Amino acid sequence: MIQYILAFFVFVFSTLASWYEGSEIRSNPWEWKYSAFFSQMLHGSITNSSDISQLDHFIYAAKFKPAFPLLMALSIIYIVMLTGYWLCRRSNKRFRLFYAGSLLFWILGAMVADSPTIGGHYFTMLFMTAGAGSAAMALLSVLRAKCWRGEELK
């Protein structure tokens, strides 16, 4: 329970800090075309800073000031992994299926891999590492289950 509370507070703090740091997008009109993804979906073209969506603050912060967005992503990944472990710890099959979701992390990593910004590189590394960690956990649960049942590994 302490882990959830701590991770939740880290998530809330890093979300507020990311939102604040990302508000810098409002004073950089040359970046609106590349970082105001949600605003362009909502309004079409952006003519002034009041057209910028609050969600675009997070995109801008993730691209150019990635410390707090990375902390935000790490804390939510930790909460999801902790919840998955807690829900699936009694059933090895469910546990393996949960961590087999590592493919989603690799897909996310591949989606941001082409980003020319420092934040894109950091998020690629984060998602690829989380995917590798999840795959390793799935492999370890399979190996542990086979060894526990006394099966020979092939």
Question: What does each of the following model-derived ranges do?
Answer:
Residues 1-17, 62-69, 147-148, 153:
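Cytoplasmic juxtamembrane interface segments
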Residues 4-11, 75-79, 129-144:
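Hydrophobic cores of alpha-helical transmembrane segments in multi-pass inner/ER membrane proteins
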Residues 13-39:
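Membrane-helix exit/juxtamembrane interface segments
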Residues 15-22, 83-90, 110-117, 142-146:
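Transmembrane helix-loop junctions and nearby membrane-interface residues
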Residues 30-59:
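Extracytosolic (periplasmic/ER-lumenal) interhelical loops and adjacent juxtamembrane/interface segments
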Residues 50-80:
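Individual transmembrane alpha-helix segments
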Residues 69-105:
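Cytoplasmic juxtamembrane regions at transmembrane-helix boundaries
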Residues 96-154:
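Alpha-helical transmembrane segments of multi-pass integral membrane proteins
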